[in-house]
Amino acid sequence: MLQQTTVAACVPRFERFIGRFPDARSLADASLEEVLAEWEGMGYYTRARNLWKAARLIVERHGGDLPSGVTELRALPGIGDYTAGAIRSIAFDLPAGMVDANIRRVLGRVEGVESSVKDAERRIFQTCLSLSAAGSPRLVNQALMELGSLVCLPRDPLCGECPLSAFCRARQEGRFDRWHGSVPREKRTLQVEEVCVTAALEDRWLLSRPCDGRWRGMWEFPRRRLDGAGAFAAAVRDLLERDFGVCPSGVHYRGSLRYRVTVHDTRLHVLSAWLPHEPGCASRSWRLVLPGELDSLPLPSPMRRIARSLSPGCADALDPGALKEPCER
């Protein structure tokens, strides 16, 4: 959870998740839909999918017990060198190298490893591994992370408070910028326009389940990316006719919302429509659900916000916006 989510946001979600799935066996026995529903709102759902897949392999290959070997850990979905090292050292107190941004900065500065050196990562990893083997791996690796987080800062490091300052080449030479400083984050610059439809057949809402992409395995109101500006109603009609085999009526603009995923800044335009019959010859997985069923299904955060807007008195969950199209009769 902490790989992409803040500690403050993680703590209550972690406690709830562990309460629901206290061990690998209970997680493996759950359906993917149940796991995604429990993860809802934290984004980066590949993490949840990998956890579920890893739990099933842990039960199948290791009898439900998490392995301590780096090779066995690396064979589990979602576990790379860093996570394997963190599990081995922190959970089992066994020697392991683990290099995150904080440890990279601390050891890079102490050792004088320039960011541009081709084998910098390998050298820092080996230094971390050696240090972890010299004491309690659990304490050493966590101490290095804390040192980077609280003292060896990317800018204006607190060298006077650092227990390693006497051995630090970066301090000796006064060149902190050369030794593995922070990596600039990629700016969110890609603007994306999407259209989404809350399509109703009597008192039921049409949902679809993507088979790929970041929301695969979850449920969403039918959605597609817009190639050009405007023409929302036409895009919705095309979406429902092409992918669900149904021609809608009463299409009108409801509002919009914005959401961000990695470098994509997306404006999602929401329209509503009526369906004359159930979808036929659909190219997507779909289902019709009653309003009360929405709470129990895994929905991405933007879709959960749209679902809330369907409740009486909650229409302000969407931005009415300036881009509106006339209602269609």
Where are the language model's segments positioned?
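Catalytic cores of DNA base-excision repair glycosylases
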Residues: L2-D177, G245-C247
